[in-house]
């Protein structure tokens, strides 16, 4: 009611304003106006309700038609609003005119009152009927709107129907054309069959057939064209015409400037064949992104050309830098300030202190005195707190002398046993060195680079470095192979003060993206951890390439547990006036490790290993070291069968798996690890109690590092080494390691070594101790390039692709295979097969018997070796037993031994003495015989797959059937470097036949199979580092 009253007041006020001219109003006029007001109010309410209803209806309808006719619905709404506004204006004008009429007709007010009353009654009675009429009107309006919508829908449907009719008509026309073309083609084909016969002159006609076939294909494709595709083709044609018009217009404009454009126009207009060919490829190639992704076959690049281009690019990027042309920022290396307590120490006190600290020996001038506590080395409080937090109470012997020497800015060679804290010895001075320099700007490389030989050691150093770098606000990036390079590139681009890397991946980073990933301009501190392995011949080129790109006045530090004398000369090439700090002698196993060496047979090693595992595994973790990846996997299977859960770690495992295996082993998830020497360096595992050298280490340094995995940080450890009699040459290094570490040498090991020395002396050989540093890496020189070219020539020759200049290469590979065969040919005269029954004694037989007796007498005369020699060995033994004397070995003269040795040598050299040939001729001169041809092909030194291919049952059977020769496999396989014992032979194929041609055919087929396999191996060859460690 409040709203109605307000409305009533507003309406009355408006009426008061409109009727302000006649101020004198009668009571009857007021009543009639009130009635009119009431009626108008009721009408307004009805109108509002009806409008709201109509709005709801319209909304629901508009929702249904929204997707198809949004714009039309908006126009209808606007037209409705216009109609409503017009109707409102009409109502207002009518109400105003009524008011004027009421004011002008005041004299006949009574009659009008009566009329008004009667009208009000009629309206009151017919109120319901008026409402119904209004509803009818609204329904009619809605129906009109529906009709309008239906009209639009019908119009759309009509358009679609016409479009379909056009498409159907077009399809029908296409079908008719296709049928006509097919009929014509059939007629032509029949005419050609009837009227033509093939001749050499018709070769030119065959060239036209593909074009006709293409036409037929295009016409058949047109039959199955979808209407939408046809429409899109029309659009493309229009776009193309538009582009051609624009090109022609541009050409016409440019035609005035010079004659060159005229040539372009003529090319476009005359070369129709090119345009047709382009049509088949696709339209608008400049706008077709999908088509641009595919390159044409004509633009293929030669693989070898691309490879050589890449190699030359790599060489350019990694060439040594001319440091004289670069202005480097000055930096400070000497930060060490000697505290008064150390300054007061005399030289004698310093020597005594060094002797107490496990016998520190120092070489080099100007070495500072060793420190006694962390506060004396000049590090910040943040680092001191971190040291205390992580349990570093006091410096170890190597740290006491190495830290002040490095803080003084000197180059250093640090030699200390495993687990002695070498990592902290070079990390603490590095932090002080970096903090003294300005912070990195965008695009600048690191300040410190730490290089390691293995990925595991790189990860371990990174983990140790991050303990301190977080508090100092420094960034550390570990760069190593085997993982995705993109993440490492992203980290380097963000900037890092410290890079821990393996040399191979570091070179990749320096060469990546034309050297924009990182650079070595800011590097002033270089660390080589495990420096002896870094300077092994396999690693030297990569290490030197990185070091040569660093500024010459850098500070370089080297650390290792072993440092052979042969490596010192190489190390001094990159050091300037170094100080050598050695702790505890060179390469010594820690005294906390109890070492045991067991001389054992190969078959009993696994049972002994199970015994050790049963005794030690409950006390902690165990590492078993083997020499090869295959042995690691084989031993893993054997241990799993014996119910020992374990894991294997070697260079052939993916890097992600290697990381997870090391983490599981460190965390104690798995307590047994079978590994090659990949895990022997820098791997720090807590609670590692036992190391088993299942395969004996082949040099001293390898033994030291293997045994050094246990007994770290003052804990007790055990190291067992298995050695067989065949591995006696390694016993000397193990005896040396035991003696230097103060461990008693087992007597059976000493006996094994002394027997081996005696044997070598008897054979006239010199005993050489292997240092383990004889591996060779890639030298990137002309010799290697020549070898690579030779390999390519052999491949070309084998495949028949050689040039006329390279015809000799075809013979080379056959000559190499022939030399490896080391073939031995023999021709034997065999007796002709006859009847098994003995022949009757005839005159001929008697003559043969006489010849045999004479030969026997002559042999006895030639071999007149005394009375004992005429009696056989059995007779000698019988005589000894009858006499009752001791049974002695039968006496054999030196001449007999010499003859036996000569026969063996002759057999090896495939030599038949002349005397024997004469005897055979005399024996077989009058007998019926046939020749048997034999040839032996030694295949022991060929690759395993080549041997398998030749010695397979199917291959031998196929060769025998083809050549009609018998082929047998004889001898045993001996690995490279191992010579067969007396009476044994390397594996070989024996070919036998009565026909010499059959033997030659069999040999040629065997040669062909081996050649194919060798070529296949060369093509699939991946250059790998055969050493124990890899730079990845």
Curated annotation (Swiss-Prot):
Renumbered ranges of motif Q motif: 372-400
Lipidated positions per record (N-myristoyl glycine): 2
Modified residues (Phosphoserine): 199, 295-296, 346, 804, 929
Source organism per UniProt: Rattus norvegicus (Rat)
UniProt name for this protein: Probable ATP-dependent RNA helicase DDX46
Residue location of crosslink Glycyl lysine isopeptide (Lys-Gly) (interchain with G-Cter in SUMO2): 186, 325, 779, 908, 916
Helicase C-terminal domain location: 592-753
PTM sites of type N6-acetyllysine: 263, 776, 904
Biological function: Component of the 17S U2 SnRNP complex of the spliceosome, a large ribonucleoprotein complex that removes introns from transcribed pre-mRNAs. The 17S U2 SnRNP complex (1) directly participates in early spliceosome assembly and (2) mediates recognition of the intron branch site during pre-mRNA splicing by promoting the selection of the pre-mRNA branch-site adenosine, the nucleophile for the first step of splicing. Within the 17S U2 SnRNP complex, DDX46 plays essential roles during assembly of pre-spliceosome and proofreading of the branch site.
Renumbered ranges of motif DEAD box: 529-532
Membership in a protein family: Belongs to the DEAD box helicase family. DDX46/PRP5 subfamily.
Record region (Disordered): 1-227
Biased composition (Basic and acidic residues): 26-49, 112-200
One record GO biological process: U2-type prespliceosome assembly
Phosphotyrosine found at: 294
Enzyme Commission designation: 3.6.4.13
Compartments it resides in: Nucleus speckle; Nucleus, Cajal body
Positions of the Helicase ATP-binding domain: 403-581
Region forming the signal peptide: none
Basic residues bias (residue ranges): 1-24, 50-73, 81-103
Catalytic activity: ATP + H2O = ADP + phosphate + H(+)
